[in-house]
From Swiss-Prot:
Physiological role: Ufmylation 'reader' component of a translocation-associated quality control pathway, a mechanism that takes place when a ribosome has stalled during translation, and which is required to degrade clogged substrates. Specifically recognizes and binds ufmylated ribosomes when a ribosome has stalled, promoting the transport of stalled nascent chain via the TRAPP complex to lysosomes for degradation.
This protein's record includes keyword Ribonucleoprotein: no
Taxonomic classification: Eukaryota, Metazoa, Chordata, Craniata, Vertebrata
Subunit composition and interactions: Associates (via N-terminus) with ribosomes.
Intramembrane segments as residue ranges: 117-137
Cytoplasmic compartment residues: 1-116, 138-194
Chief subcellular location: endoplasmic reticulum
Protein name: SAYSvFN domain-containing protein 1
Gene: SAYSD1
GO biological process, one term: protein quality control for misfolded or incompletely synthesized proteins
Keywords: Cytoplasmic vesicle, Endoplasmic reticulum, Membrane
Chain segments carrying region Middle helical (MH): 102-116
């Protein structure tokens, strides 16, 4: 068993040495390509993309099982070490706080929202006349729900959330969970056995 382990480590070391030259050749980009890559804007990810994108764990977070652990696991589970909270990745850095809107930007945002509501009312009246008012109303609810459920990346800087109506300063409420804490509780905790 020790011989197989030594062979595995040697093969992994050789693969690491072979991978290094190819990585260094890829890093020799021209300055124009680097500038182009730096100026290319990233598309904001929506709430649906966050749920559909699979992010593999980095190799450093994947622990190699010891021989004693490998012998104790049932056959077929050798590649999956048990979950432990010590393997959690550190939380991502917090973005800087949003800058408050200037009065000009606030009036523009208010007028755009007012125009959207007026357009919605005019279209609702038109569809009521055509006897499709209920269908239009229900379908338009999906749009307003989408606008209300956008992720933080998609919101404009300084745009208030719906929560700020009930908690104007958006201050933490004693005993409540943050979104990160709730997500950690829902996703990282093992499922309860029934």
């Amino acid at each position: 068993m020790e011989q197989r382990l030594a062979e595995f480590r040697a093969a992994r070391k050789r693969a690491g040495l072979v991978a290094e030259p190819s990585a260094s050749s890829q890093s020799t980009q021209t300055s124009g390509e680097k500038a182009e890559a730096a100026t290319t804007p990233k598309a904001p990810s929506g709430w649906l993309k966050r749920f559909l994108v699979w992010k593999p764990r980095p190799p450093s977070a994947q622990a190699q099982p010891s021989l004693a652990q490998g012998a104790a696991w049932p056959r077929g589970l050798e590649s999956q070490p048990p979950w432990s909270p010590a393997e959690e990745a550190p939380p991502p850095p917090q973005p800087p706080p949003p800058q408050p809107l200037t009065p000009r930007d606030r009036s523009l945002l208010t007028s755009v929202t007012l125009l959207k509501v007026l357009l919605w009312l005019v279209l609702l009246g038109l569809f009521v006349e055509l006897e499709f008012g209920l269908a239009y109303f229900v379908l338009s609810l999906f749009y307003w729900m989408y606008v209300g459920m956008r992720g933080p990346e998609e919101k404009m800087q300084g745009e208030k959330s719906a929560y700020s109506v009930f908690n104007p300063g958006c201050e933490a409420i004693q005993g409540s969970l943050t979104a990160e804490q709730l997500e950690r509780e829902l996703h990282l905790r093992p499922l309860p056995r029934r």
